[in-house]
């Protein structure tokens, strides 16, 4: 009875071991080009594809006679052969290792080999695990290029074989390794200390440095005295650097580091080293839309504003003048030590065309140039040196209003003008066209003395004045109040527009360029006809009406 029970038990064990999916022991019988023959003590030897025995480098790490674990795929495949799998057995072994590591909180070796949503994938002996982004390190890590492809230690924090789900943490390993070292470092750490560290990670705002169990932040503004666009300009991941502890918050375990603080501040007493108007050479480090930055010494940069790049083009883009790494000559315009700002000038190291023009073109000098533009207030003329001069509307003609006189000019016309004024500081040149000729007003009053009797033509009138056209395109003014005191309303009404009239020069207003006239006094017999001989037969009722009103107004005043 006992023998029968023992026999049945042994047979049942064999049956369990030979069920599909079970792991059994086998011996390598032979190794062929494409297949490996394995004897697992079953009905027949099984051929397993050689690829299942290759390592990650594609090499075989077995030899004939080795005993290995294999998974039983099928006892009978329909052709009388048993199917075995080395690959499934290795995967089973890998899961056992992970389960053991998870239970005992041991580390496993894996390789980060890809990025997925929320984290990364890790290869653990043919098992694909998930590494959350927050568990890569004790500090946030955006870029894992320096970690990918390397064998790293991880801790298994979640395991579910049925769902094929494995979650690992690298952060847990680091925290465990650093705990003792970290405690000692935190105890000894003091502000102002000089320490060594290894750059672990770079961000847009700085670099995280491992001080030996404790990470510190080296902010981008504390990397160098000069302006730094990105931390990679100063340090790289893996660099061992000397740094200074700037601030240490023990409660929050936060450490602020400084690299530039290891050296002297180059901004101290910089105004003494570089007084205003000092000329020096520097290297262009960066271009912007508003100017370029020039390094004048290690850690010190100044800004050449776009307005200080070229004398004649105020809106030129910096890239049209300089390029990065150009060595240029600049002038110190202003230094603000408190705000650590230096204003530099590029154009100040070149000839100032405005100053040069002022030295070679005094008032009254004639110039020749093409019209560059015509505006509501005047004409701009291009001059030598790439600068412009302005002819104001009031300086186009002596006798014709500027708005009318400017009409005969057009862009690109070559014209002459006279220099009226040069303001090199404000970069302004005033020119005149009418000054090319004598002022007809001055000429006229020079040739005609007060009291001279001349002939004019009535041009227009209002309730106060009669405007009289004179020779040389000049005009004179007769005040109606002067007329009504001498002549009757009937006589006044004889006057008509375009009538020739004898007038006497009364006075000159040089400032306002006005010639005042009076009607020439004549004998009583001659008052019948105030006007000079004329063929004008035109009656002007409006003129007569105005004269009548003016006459009445004058009488009422009396």
Curated annotation (Swiss-Prot):
Statement: the UniProt record of this protein carries the keyword Repeat: yes
Keywords: Repeat, Ribonucleoprotein, Ribosomal protein, RNA-binding
Pfam families, alphabetized: S1
GO molecular function: mRNA binding; structural constituent of ribosome
Family annotation (PROSITE patterns): S1 (PS50126)
CDD domains: S1_RPS1_repeat_ec1_hs1, S1_RPS1_repeat_ec2_hs2, S1_RPS1_repeat_ec3
GO terms under cellular component: cytosolic small ribosomal subunit
The S1 motif domain, residue ranges: 21-87, 105-171, 192-260, 277-347, 364-434, 451-520
Cysteines paired by S-S bonds: none
Example GO biological process: translation
Known function: Binds mRNA; thus facilitating recognition of the initiation point. It is needed to translate mRNA with a short Shine-Dalgarno (SD) purine-rich sequence.
PANTHER family documented for this protein: 30S RIBOSOMAL PROTEIN S1, SMALL RIBOSOMAL SUBUNIT PROTEIN BS1C
Family: Belongs to the bacterial ribosomal protein bS1 family.
Protein name in UniProt: Small ribosomal subunit protein bS1
Species whose genome carries this gene: Buchnera aphidicola subsp. Acyrthosiphon pisum (strain APS)
Lineage: Bacteria, Pseudomonadati, Pseudomonadota, Gammaproteobacteria, Enterobacterales
């Amino acid at each position: 009875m006992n023998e029968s029970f023992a026999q049945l038990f042994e047979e049942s064990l064999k049956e369990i071991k030979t069920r599909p999916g079970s792991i059994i022991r086998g011996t390598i019988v032979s190794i062929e080009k494409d297949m490996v023959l394995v004897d697992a003590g079953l009905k027949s030897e099984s051929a397993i594809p050689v690829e299942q025995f290759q390592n990650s480098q594609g090499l075989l790490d077995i030899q004939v006679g080795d005993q290995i674990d294999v998974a039983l795929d099928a006892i009978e495949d329909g052709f009388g052969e048993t199917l075995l799998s080395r690959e499934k057995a290795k995967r089973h072994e890998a899961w056992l290792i992970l389960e053991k590591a998870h239970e005992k909180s041991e580390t496993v070796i894996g390789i980060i080999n890809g990025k997925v949503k929320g984290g990364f994938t890790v290869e653990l002996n043919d098992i694909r695990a998930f590494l959350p982004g927050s568990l890569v390190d004790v500090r946030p890590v955006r870029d894992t290029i320096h970690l990918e492809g390397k064998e790293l230690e991880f801790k298994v924090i979640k395991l579910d074989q049925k769902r094929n789900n494995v979650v690992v943490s690298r952060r847990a390993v680091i925290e465990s390794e650093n705990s003792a070292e970290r405690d000692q470092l935190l105890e000894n750490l003091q502000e102002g200390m000089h320490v060594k560290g290894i750059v672990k990670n770079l961000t847009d705002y700085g670099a995280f440095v491992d001080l030996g169990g404790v990470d510190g932040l080296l902010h981008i503004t504390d990397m160098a005295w000069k302006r730094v666009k990105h931390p990679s300009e100063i340090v790289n991941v893996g660099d061992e650097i000397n740094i200074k502890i700037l601030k240490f918050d023990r409660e929050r375990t936060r450490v602020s580091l400084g690299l530039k603080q290891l050296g002297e501040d180059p901004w101290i007493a910089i105004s003494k080293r570089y007084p205003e108007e000092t000329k020096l050479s520097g290297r262009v480090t960066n271009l912007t839309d508003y100017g370029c930055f020039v390094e004048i010494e290690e850690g010190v940069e100044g800004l050449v504003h776009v307005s200080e790049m070229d004398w004649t083009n105020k809106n030129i883009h910096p890239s049209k003048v300089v390029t990065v790494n150009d060595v240029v000559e600049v002038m110190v315009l202003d230094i603000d030590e408190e705000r650590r700002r230096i204003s530099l000038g590029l154009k100040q190291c070149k000839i100032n065309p405005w100053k040069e023009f002022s030295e070679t073109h005094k008032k009254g000098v004639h110039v020749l140039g093409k019209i560059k533009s015509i505006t509501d207030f005047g004409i701009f003329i291009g001059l030598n040196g790439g600068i412009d001069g302005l002819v104001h509307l009031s300086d186009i003609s002596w006798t014709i209003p500027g708005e009318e006189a400017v009409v005969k000019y057009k862009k690109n016309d070559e014209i002459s003008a006279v220099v009226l004024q040069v303001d090199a500081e404000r970069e302004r040149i005033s020119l005149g066209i009418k000054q090319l000729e004598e002022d007809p007003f001055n000429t006229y009053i020079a040739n005609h003395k007060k009291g001279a009797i001349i002939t004019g033509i009535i041009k227009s009138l209002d309730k106060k004045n009669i405007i009289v056209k004179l020779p040389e395109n000049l005009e004179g003014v007769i005040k109606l109040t002067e007329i009504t005191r001498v002549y009757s309303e009937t006589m006044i009404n004889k006057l008509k527009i375009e009538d020739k009239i004898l007038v006497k020069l009364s006075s000159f207003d040089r400032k306002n360029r006005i010639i005042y006239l009076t009607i020439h006094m004549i004998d009583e017999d001659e008052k019948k006809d105030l006007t000079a001989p004329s063929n004008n037969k035109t009656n002007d009722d409006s003129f007569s009406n105005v004269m009548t009103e003016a006459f009445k107004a004058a009488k009422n005043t009396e």
